[in-house]
Structures are given as C-alpha cells and as structure tokens.
Amino acid sequence: MSSLNNEEWDLLISGKKATLQYPIPLLCYPAPEVVSIAQIIDHTQLSLSATGSQIDVLCAEAKEYGFATVCVRPDYVSRAVQYLQGTQVGVTCVIGFHEGTYSTDQKVSEAKRAMQNGASELDMVMNYPWLSEKRYTDVFQDIRAVRLAAKDAILKVILETSQLTADEIIAGCVLSSLAGADYVKTSTGFNGPGASIENVSLMSAVCDSLQSETRVKASGGIRTIEDCVKMVRAGAERLGASAGVKIVNETRLGNRQVDEPMEPTNY
C-alpha cells in the first residue's frame, strides 16, 4: 500500500465508496448496557492549562468508576501511568495534538516517548489538511510511520470530522484502516463540532465495508448517557468524554433515557 501514488489511492478509495449501501442507516447497532458504559469511555483531560493535581483527580476518578483509559497530553503520561499502576485502567496519549500538522518525525518521536513512558493507547491526529488536498500517499505514510513506531499500542486516528466532507471522511477511514489503525476517531474537541450521529454512522459503515478490525471512537460533545447511547447505536465502540463521571452518575440515578428511532439519512 505504501507504494501507491495519489491517483491510485483515489481509485481505491472511490472503489470502496462504491461498495457502501446508501442511504447510510443511522442508529442500526444495538443499544449498550448503560450500567457498564464506563468500560468504553476514555476519561479525558486535554486542557493546555491542566495541572498535575487535575491529572491526579482524573486518574482517581478513572479508578473509582472503571473507565477504559485516561486520555492525557504527552507530558502527563508518566504521572498517569504511575498513579494507575496495578489497576485495569489504561493510559491514552494524544499525538500531534490538536492540529495534526506536526511533521511525521515529530509524531513518531511523540509516539515513541509515550510508549517509553508507559502509554497503552495513542490518539493520533491525522494531517487532515493533507487529506483535503488529496495527498493520500502522505496521509497514509504519516499514519503508517506512527503505527510501526508503536506496534504494541492501540492506535486511534483522529479525523477531525468537523473539517471534512463526507467523501473526505470516507477517504480518511480507508487510509487509516489500511495503515493499521485500531480505531478511527471523530474529533479532537478543539476544532468545531464534535461527534455527530451521521458521521459516526458513516465511519462505521466504511469500516464494516472494509471487513477490517478497525473500529470507531466518538468524541467531542458527549455529555450525557443519552449521547453515549446514540453514539453506540451509530456504531461507536469507544467514547471520549471529559464528562464521564457525570455520565456514569446518571446511570446510577436511573436516568437511562434511550433515543427515539431515527430515519436513515443519505450522504
């Protein structure tokens, strides 16, 4: 795949798009067990002004509530790993965050450092300006370089769907999956609207059509248990949220509202 030029990638992506069933169905996956929703949440603190004590609180909450991972910036990986030692909670480190325009060498360096410091998962921002310019070979090689530098990590590639067209989202999913990503992720949460049912459904449909093991992570604007249920029903298997404690407490209080069925949409 790394030897394909942009024109060849364009043909491949167009072929994958042609296999999709239109209209893309919404909310066609089973609803989650809300009592165990914490197990698929990456509990997130990515503020540039975050302090060490805030990371400690994040980790303490993750231990108490049983979140999948904590998601932090590179400088806090070691601290989070140390705090969570002996627990089942993983540590996710963001890479190339949040612009995605870091050089490939910078992303690889961040990935290696994160792994050395104990991160178990990486959330890498795709160079989405390249994607919009149809620089598909560069996008693929950028992701592939991080994949090869962190072979033991779960790798999630952030598309930044708010900045992309539907066709670009399809292309981003194809490139990420073929480069070896474990997940494609909607958003950084720092650039426009976050996850939408339509985009998560489209990403899920693309991954399904590829018959790959790449899954979908929804993030950005997920603040309630209802938001979580909708995203899972749209196909997300992991959720990123800074409101994880509030969400889990909703389930404990019995607030388990499930969204109403929606009609399929067409891209």
From Swiss-Prot:
This enzyme's EC code(s): 4.1.2.4
List of catalytic residues: D123, K185, K217
InterPro entries membership: Aldolase_TIM (IPR013785), DeoC (IPR011343), DeoC/FbaB/LacD_aldolase (IPR002915), DeoC_typeI (IPR028581)
Lyase recorded as keyword: yes
Name of the protein: Deoxyribose-phosphate aldolase
Gene Ontology BP terms: carbohydrate catabolic process; deoxyribonucleotide catabolic process; deoxyribose phosphate catabolic process
Family as reported in the entry's similarity comment: Belongs to the DeoC/FbaB aldolase family. DeoC type 1 subfamily.
Main location: cytoplasm
GO molecular function, one term: deoxyribose-phosphate aldolase activity
